[in-house]
Amino acid sequence: MKSSMPVNIVVAHGLEAKALVKMLKLERHQGSSEFLEYSNSNKLRLVVSGIGKEAVAAAVAYLGEQQASADGEIRAWLNVGIAGHRDAPLGSAWLGNKITDHSSGSSAYPPQLIEGVRVGSVVTVDEPETSYPLAAAYEMEASAFYAEATKYSTAELVQVFKVISDNLENPISEIDLKLVPDLIAAHIPQLLTLIEGMSELVEQHNCSQRLPSYYHEVCSKMRLTVNQRLQLKRLCQRYKALGLEAELAKVAGLKGGDAKQLMRQLAERID
């Protein structure tokens, strides 16, 4: 397992968490009194949100605000849970490459950058689905999870993974809840591939977006307005993108000089 896995996993029910807690060696995290949380030393976090769109949106917002980084670093987000399908075999599973909110009719299309994991459609409903009109995984959280998590991360770093627990021949009313951990556990290899792949993607993103130390030095030594901080951030990112990060140190301004003059100097060197 990778040493650094900056991924937030969100499940609706404690039974969905059970296999993940064991697989990822997570321990109870004493954080919110509202949500059951787990974490490990590899930066993984898991939160049990409760069932439904409002509950999952609240859990995502709670974690997202708690983890907001001044450096602009982000984390990956993964929703894991059970779902129903018209005729898919029990225990089959896929990543949602199309997530449709049934009540609004709107759809989202999470970009798929990780190979080796099956993909398919997911439909989020407000009440348990029993007729499964479309060839899709029916569940109650994905659309709200995706909408909220993409406020804190990029689209390709927000994914949903659904395991089929019921279908027309095995209706939702007959689900044996004690089997839910086993349904999730059967996909441990796929989930580990997914989590490790997402970890690599988020680390690549954060490395490319990480601000040069010059930015923090200027902010600590000069009085900058909010707009000037944003301007400085954009300029530093441009220098980094152009491979000119070393040139930043050559620009005067770390001794309490004029902020407007500093911005002009920085802009002139790359215009």
Predicted features, each with a name:
Residues 1-4, 72-73:
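Polar low-complexity intrinsically disordered regions
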Residues 3-28:
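N-terminal beta1-alpha1 ligand-phosphate binding loop
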Residues 31-271:
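Glycine-rich phosphate- or other oxyanion-binding loops that anchor nucleotides, phosphorylated ligands
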